[in-house]
Regions:
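Short S/T/G/P-rich N-terminal loop/turn motif that feeds into the first structured element of a domain
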Residues: 1-51, 60-68, 84-106
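Short arginine-rich
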Residues: 76-79, 83-86
Length: 106
């Protein structure tokens, strides 16, 4: 395994602007995929509005560049003001990764 870093974003959605949220989430996913250092992303959200997005990056520098992306920063501000009742971000270096891959992560 090559060195990688992970950003774990957990959130609880409000009921506000569901269509706008879905559109922005799709736009941010496409934008993240185009960023230098991006490896992969998986997201899930329950019926209760609680969600988690796990995004893998090649380096801390690529994560910092993603955070500075103007479109991403704008989406973050809209998320804080409209779409999320709470959220947290965890950034960590991946020391070990193993398991059985299945269709959930393809």
């Amino acid at each position: 395994m090559t060195e990688s870093w992970v950003v774990i974003f957990t959130s609880t959605r409000t009921s506000q602007d569901a269509d706008g949220y879905r559109a922005m989430a799709a736009q941010m996913e496409a934008l993240a995929h185009a960023q230098p250092g991006f490896i992969s992303m998986q997201s899930v959200r329950g019926d209760d509005g609680v969600g988690i997005t796990v995004c893998y990056w090649e380096s801390e520098q690529s994560i910092a560049a993603w955070k500075r992306n103007v479109d991403h920063a704008s989406a973050q501000q809209q998320g804080i003001s409209t779409w999320y009742s709470d959220y947290s971000v965890t950034i960590a270096k991946v020391e070990r990764q193993y398991g059985k891959r299945n269709s959930l992560f393809k």
